[in-house]
Amino acid sequence: MRLSRKLTLLPLLLLQPAIMFGQDAHALAGKVDQRYNRMHSLEARFTETYTGAGATRTEGGTLLIKKPGRMRWDYDTPRPKLFVTDGNMAWFYVPGEQQARRSPIKQLDDLRSPLRYLLGKSKLEKELTGLSIASNAKPLNAGGVVLRGVPRGMQDRISETLLEVAPDGAITRIRVEELDGSITDLRFLQQKEDVQIADRRFRFTPPPGVEVVQGTELVN
């Protein structure tokens, strides 16, 4: 799967548990907003599983987020690769390759786009249209609740996004299903808030001799 076929939201609990805890989609979205709007930075381990075209691929690494607008996906399993943005320009590079790809962040066609609400002050209900409790989706973690919606502006590509939300409002999983039937499943572990992250971690300079290619889809 392509990094541009990733992206970025998370699952929450079934309808019955949601009712039991007195939660609805609006209240749950508010809890998520409150958590991430007060946060300045985040570090987490992630796993990403892509299923499509008769194949399944699982990758993993470390995610760094720092406001405003900066994000770094450092893949280390099964091979190193990097997706990074400083808030203006996004880069994708695989060590050892002869090309690095870049795109202005506003032009980027990437499934990570729903994660932009984590990068500034925003509201989940504005980022996802048709936001509701996914009563037929089983959460992976105890006490979790699953939300369903479609990222605004991506209705021509994505049929459904599920977000799993922990009782404290943390997003622990994002599952994105595209119109072609492919599925990207992102899970976030060992989340650390407001950690010190140097600004240089979100800048990228291509190694000598590496060609820079411009495009809106960065990752294969």
State each model region's role.
Residues K126-T216:
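Gly/Pro-enriched, hydrophobic low-complexity segments
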Residues M1-L10:
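Bacterial N-terminal signal peptides that target proteins for export
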Residues Q98-V145:
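Flexible, surface-exposed loop/linker segments and immediately adjacent secondary-structure boundaries
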Residues M39-S41, T58-G60, K66-P68, P78, ...:
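Extracytoplasmic
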Residues L9-A18:
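Bacterial N-terminal signal peptides
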Residues A18-T58, P206-N220:
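N-terminal leader/targeting segments and the immediate start of mature chains
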Residues T62-P114, T184-D185:
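An acidic-aromatic
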